[in-house]
Amino acid sequence: MEHKDDDDDDVSFAKWMSSFWGHSWREEDQRGLRERHRPQATSHRKTSLPCPLPVLPRIPSSDRHPRRHSHEDQEFRCRSSDRLPRRHSHEDQKFRCRSHVRDYGEYSEDGSFKEPLESKGRSHSKIEKFSESFERQLCFRTKRSASLGPESRKERNERECLRMEIKSRKKVEEERSSRKEEHGEAHMAPLFEKGPE
């Protein structure tokens, strides 16, 4: 008995939904549209997209990295695909397929994944850029305060302390980077001396 009530509820809900979306539930049922709502093949879904997708080689799931796609990227892809199809070389496909990996690493010719060399120095360059921008702001503030009137002794002392702090941070960073380079070279030297065994 309860089973029949559940079916009635489902039917009434389906009728309400179909009336809400502006089509008749009975007409759909008569035309057999319910049987047609099976999962579609990927080829059918691809043909129904507004712009064709380029054929790219599959990347193993272990090599995939998340990438955010902006609205401009989608517009660019749609506009570029509107042009006449052109033949892509193997290198073009590699580039298109793996361009999102450029921040994470690169592939060698044999297909193995390598960490980028620049990532090690990237943090150092960010620190340098930050300290330079900080110095520029500091200079701008001192010029502005000088134009407003004579500096107080307190302001001058603060400015000198900031300059000394910046210089000491730069020295520490340079020492760290030189130690890392020396340390890296020290580890690499014995490897080259041994040679193949």
Curated annotation (Swiss-Prot):
Biased composition (Basic residues): 34-47
InterPro entries: LNP1
Protein name per the record: Leukemia NUP98 fusion partner 1 homolog
Compositional bias of kind Basic and acidic residues: 70-128, 167-186
PANTHER family documented for this protein: LEUKEMIA NUP98 FUSION PARTNER 1
Region Disordered: start-end pairs: 28-128, 167-197
Pfam name, any one: LNP1
